């Protein structure tokens, strides 16, 4: 009996010692992992606010003193979030030294959302400077690094398509827009690739196809009452009907665009309105709208009156 009781005790002690050893290993791995994770609650707070309240996220990030003293993981996220917040708040990104901190930390080998975002915003920095080919390279890297198909991936494709379109590569631009649309199908954000697809058809003089996709884009914009996009699409309709010489319908759409657009957005709309009035042989109205658009042009670009 004693002999049989002795074995369980021995095994119990052995099991306990193994458990302690494994626990120590797991603890060290956990601590190692934690050392490379973000510690700043301000960064995590800014990250959580970024999509809906980018202005609040920017305020939080700008409140961080001495970001250069943050741990490496925190510095990388700070660089990424600050670039993202500036971009979302329409603030110039400047040079690429900030975002490169994030790019170097997150790398380009392992798929992760932050790695993809780092390369995307590096591309946005290049695009801001007019380096389209470098922007395309970084957008493609961002696509490769994205681990999931979501709205952010669709946005990358949409921006990639715009780059291709600028370079006159309409076929690959169309492919990128369609990929973005497939990812977003059924969501309100599909308005962007739909308008992009329509724009390519318009540039290829396929006006009926352009009208079809502009209508789909308009339907999406109306559902969410995106006034900026609604005004832009009304303007698109007016341009097509003006080219089709259907000046009555062109005037209807440009009038809708002007009603929806804000003062700063309406300069090109007033200029198109003047052209449509001229085509309708309403010369006094054409002169009125042409002269009306000039102060807006001057407000938006005080150094140039060439458009007026």
Where are these regions (language model features)?
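Sec-dependent bacterial lipoprotein signal peptides
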Residues: 2-32
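A "functional boundary" signal
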Residues: 34-308
């Amino acid at each position: 009996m004693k002999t049989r009781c002795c074995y369980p005790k021995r095994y119990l002690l052995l099991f306990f010692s193994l458990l302690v050893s494994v626990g120590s290993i797991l603890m060290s791995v956990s601590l190692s992992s934690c050392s490379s994770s973000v510690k700043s609650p301000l960064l995590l707070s800014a990250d959580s606010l970024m999509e809906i309240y980018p202005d609040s996220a920017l305020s939080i990030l700008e409140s961080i003193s001495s970001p250069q003293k943050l741990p490496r993981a925190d510095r990388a996220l700070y660089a990424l979030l600050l670039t993202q917040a500036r971009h979302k708040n329409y603030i110039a990104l400047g040079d690429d030294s900030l975002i490169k901190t994030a790019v170097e930390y997150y790398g380009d080998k392992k798929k992760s959302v932050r790695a993809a975002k780092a390369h995307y915003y590096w591309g946005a920095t290049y695009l801001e400077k007019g380096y389209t080919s470098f922007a395309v390279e970084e957008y493609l890297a961002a696509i490769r690094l994205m681990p999931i198909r979501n709205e952010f991936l669709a946005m990358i494709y949409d921006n990639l398509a715009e780059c291709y379109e600028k370079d006159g590569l309409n076929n690959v631009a169309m492919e990128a827009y369609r990929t973005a649309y497939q990812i977003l199908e059924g969501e309100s954000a599909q308005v962007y690739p739909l308008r992009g697809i329509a724009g390519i058809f318009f540039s290829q003089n396929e006006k009926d196809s352009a009208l079809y996709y502009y209508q789909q884009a308009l339907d999406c914009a109306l559902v969410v009452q995106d006034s900026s996009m609604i005004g832009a699409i009304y303007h698109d309709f007016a341009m097509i009907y003006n080219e089709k010489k259907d000046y009555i319908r062109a005037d209807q759409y440009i009038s809708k665009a002007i009603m929806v657009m804000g003062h700063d957005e309406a300069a090109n709309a007033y200029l198109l309105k003047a052209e449509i009035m001229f085509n309708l042989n309403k010369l006094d109205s054409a002169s009125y709208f042409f002269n009306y658009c000039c102060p807006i042009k001057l407000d938006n670009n005080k150094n140039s009156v060439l458009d007026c």
